[in-house]
């Protein structure tokens, strides 16, 4: 059995978990998330805990049980506390602002970039060079942050671009004559 799957997922107060066959739905103060669990994983709900165990005789059941446990744990944390991702814009003239559900980015191109945020993700700009994303869905917020970063990844000579707040950009030296 997977080391990750051995630990049960505890369900905090205010979070409701509904198991319908292989479809698991988690509802909390930040919204509702659902996930279809792989057929090789058996899920049991006891009081305020979910346990995951691999079905016998299926090749990758151990790995799938660990994956299912990690995904469900992220769902429980997301609907209870939520996730945040912070992005920084480094560079002369690089700016971000919110217009309704659209994030408008000025990243040194000849035109501004309009990035429409998907449902379930909210953004705010505390300053012109900072973006704070919030969501209950860990996978979705990570994908949105990666999409925004992909418009202008940090370059290794001056460090200009869009970076995660905790990202360390490895700098290169300029070519010497």
Curated annotation (Swiss-Prot):
UniProt keyword RNA-binding, yes or no: yes
Any one GO biological process: cytoplasmic translation
Keyword flag rRNA-binding: yes
Listed SUPFAM superfamilies: Ribosomal protein L6 (SSF56053)
Molecular function as annotated in GO: rRNA binding; structural constituent of ribosome
InterPro entries: Ribosomal_uL6-like, Ribosomal_uL6-like_a/b-dom_sf, Ribosomal_uL6_a/b-dom, Ribosomal_uL6_bac-type, Ribosomal_uL6_CS
Keywords linked to the UniProt accession: Ribonucleoprotein, Ribosomal protein, RNA-binding, rRNA-binding
A GO cellular-component term linked to this record: cytosolic large ribosomal subunit
Domain of life: Bacteria
Family classification: Belongs to the universal ribosomal protein uL6 family.
Subunit and interaction comment: Part of the 50S ribosomal subunit.
Function of the molecule: This protein binds to the 23S rRNA, and is important in its secondary structure. It is located near the subunit interface in the base of the L7/L12 stalk, and near the tRNA binding site of the peptidyltransferase center.
Protein name: Large ribosomal subunit protein uL6
Organism: Histophilus somni (strain 2336)
């Amino acid at each position: 059995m997977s080391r990750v799957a051995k630990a049960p997922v505890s369900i905090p107060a205010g979070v409701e978990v509904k198991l319908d066959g292989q479809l698991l739905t988690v509802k909390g103060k930040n919204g509702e998330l659902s996930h279809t669990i792989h057929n090789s994983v058996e899920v049991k709900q006891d009081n305020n805990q979910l346990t995951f165990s691999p079905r016998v005789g299926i090749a990758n059941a151990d790995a799938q049980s660990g994956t299912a446990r990690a995904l469900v744990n992220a769902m429980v944390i997301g609907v209870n506390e939520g996730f945040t991702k912070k992005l920084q814009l480094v560079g002369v003239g690089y700016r971000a602002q919110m217009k309704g559900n659209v994030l408008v980015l000025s990243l040194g191109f000849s035109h501004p970039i309009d990035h429409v945020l998907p449902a379930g993700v909210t953004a705010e700009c505390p300053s012109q060079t900072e973006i704070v994303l919030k969501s209950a869905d860990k996978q979705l917020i990570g994908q949105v942050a990666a999409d925004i970063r992909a418009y202008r990844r940090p370059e290794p000579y001056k460090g200009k671009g869009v970076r995660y707040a905790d990202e360390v950009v490895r700098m290169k030296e300029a070519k010497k004559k």
